[in-house]
Amino acid sequence: MHTIVVGLNYKTAPVEIREKLSFIESELPQAMEALQKQKSILENVIVSTCNRTEIYAVVDQLHTGRHFVKQFLADWFDLPVETFSSYLTIREEDEAVEHLFKVTAGIDSMVLGETQILGQVKKSFLSGQEIGTTGTVYNQLFKQAVTFAKRAHNETAIGENAVSVSYAAVELAKKIFGSLQRKHVAILGAGKMGELAIENLYGSGVGKVTVINRTFEKAESLAAKFHGQAKSMKELQCSLLEADILITSTGATDYVIDYELMQFVERLRKGKPLFMVDIAVPRDIDPRVGDLPNVFLYDIDDLQGIVEANLAERERAAADITDMIGHEVIQFKDWVSTLGVVPVISALRKKANRIQEETMTSIENKMPDLTERERKILSKHTKSIINQLLKEPILQAKEMANSPKANEQLRLFQQIFGIEEAVEAEVQEMTKQELERKERAQATQTSAEPKYSF
């Protein structure tokens, strides 16, 4: 049994390759079911977003597992393997486990520390659970990874502070005004940067939105998205008097708001603070405006400096999380190592319980006059003796499972307790149950062959 991750992401493949290997979200369950039918695949979860497509799989052999995952991708997307193989990254064993923890924690994302990927991984995992493509190993691993990601975000600053210019503008506005509730934000320019800024401010609860643009129709279109009002450039001075926050992003080659205009506006505002963000290049606002009282002016370089400082904070947090992941990988490996000892412990317990039951039967035959209460007392104490005797051997068996010579030591353990045949029966029963689980999962599918997405 081996764990692998086969996939590509924004680091390894350009968007024109990523879009060819991107699963439609509604077809992910169908894709995982189709992959589960492939040779060598024991469990699988597929994670597919705009920035990554990754197949997490438990396989019986590494070489065949890699081969059949690649072939599955080729068949599903109707692409020759050689057209995308060079963009794939393959991770195995500890590296594969570590990668999942990094992805869920957001430290492998384009936006360091983002949490959207955690929800996407969780959704794929829950889908795999529902349709039966996950089993003992991935049920444990993905639950551990999701739990860890939440803890990492709670215990570090990985998700704090803005790492985009538009978010930095919101962060600054909150520092100046505290709450943005009932604040009036005006946007000068109806381009993409202005839209991003207003989107983030609107999401933070601003009360009123005004869009000012040379082309009134564009102003109307953008304002409608945020239940705001549109104004022409002729109404700029009035908007400066009314707004609490102004964000400028025009394509003008000279200052749209000069020092003299703002001197006049500032006097009429009578000390009311105005937060101004100039994200235009060239700048829309005369930098001397920042010298006026109660005017807080920031340009693109100021915001970029904040973003870089915040990103450095997140990178330090990411380093801390990477250290934490090392402990998580060890913890998962320790858990996996106990899987081999499960049938041994189960067989030992069953033998001990059988001896206890046979002993009770013998006692009852020789002492037929025992009351029900006496039988219960004897049963309770004989079971207690059995449990106390088993405690140390079970602990030893678990330690053996972590030993480099685990197979030899566990074989000797089975011989000492005379449970070799019982262990083999336990292994066969567990294998049978796993096969039945897979058959039940496949039975829920339609009788038709999987529909591939072209």
Swiss-Prot record:
Keywords, comma-separated and alphabetical: NADP, Oxidoreductase, Porphyrin biosynthesis
Chain positions covered by the region annotation Disordered: 434-454
Site keyed Important for activity: positions: H99
EC code: 1.2.1.70
Positions that bind NADP(+): G189, A190, G191, K192, M193, G194
Catalytic reaction annotation: (S)-4-amino-5-oxopentanoate + tRNA(Glu) + NADP(+) = L-glutamyl-tRNA(Glu) + NADPH + H(+)
Pathway(s) the chain acts in: Porphyrin-containing compound metabolism; protoporphyrin-IX biosynthesis; 5-aminolevulinate from L-glutamyl-tRNA(Glu): step 1/2
Residues at which substrate binds: T49, C50, N51, R52, S109, E114, T115, Q116, Q120
SUPFAM superfamilies: Glutamyl tRNA-reductase catalytic, N-terminal domain, Glutamyl tRNA-reductase dimerization domain, NAD(P)-binding Rossmann-fold domains
Active-site annotation: C50 (nucleophile)
UniProt cross-references to CDD domains, sorted A to Z: NAD_bind_Glutamyl_tRNA_reduct (cd05213)
One of the record's GO molecular function terms: NADP binding
InterPro entries in alphabetical order: 4pyrrol_synth_GluRdtase, 4pyrrol_synth_GluRdtase_dimer, 4pyrrol_synth_GluRdtase_N, GluRdtase_CS, GluRdtase_dimer_dom_sf, GluRdtase_N_sf, NAD(P)-bd_dom_sf, Shikm_DH/Glu-tRNA_Rdtase
GO terms for biological process, alphabetical: protoporphyrinogen IX biosynthetic process
Role this protein plays: Catalyzes the NADPH-dependent reduction of glutamyl-tRNA(Glu) to glutamate 1-semialdehyde (GSA).
Miscellaneous note of the record: During catalysis, the active site Cys acts as a nucleophile attacking the alpha-carbonyl group of tRNA-bound glutamate with the formation of a thioester intermediate between enzyme and glutamate, and the concomitant release of tRNA(Glu). The thioester intermediate is finally reduced by direct hydride transfer from NADPH, to form the product GSA.
Notes concerning its domains: Possesses an unusual extended V-shaped dimeric structure with each monomer consisting of three distinct domains arranged along a curved 'spinal' alpha-helix. The N-terminal catalytic domain specifically recognizes the glutamate moiety of the substrate. The second domain is the NADPH-binding domain, and the third C-terminal domain is responsible for dimerization.
Similarity section: Belongs to the glutamyl-tRNA reductase family.
NCBIfam families xref list: hemA, PRK00045.1-3
Subunit structure: Homodimer.
Name of the featured protein: Glutamyl-tRNA reductase
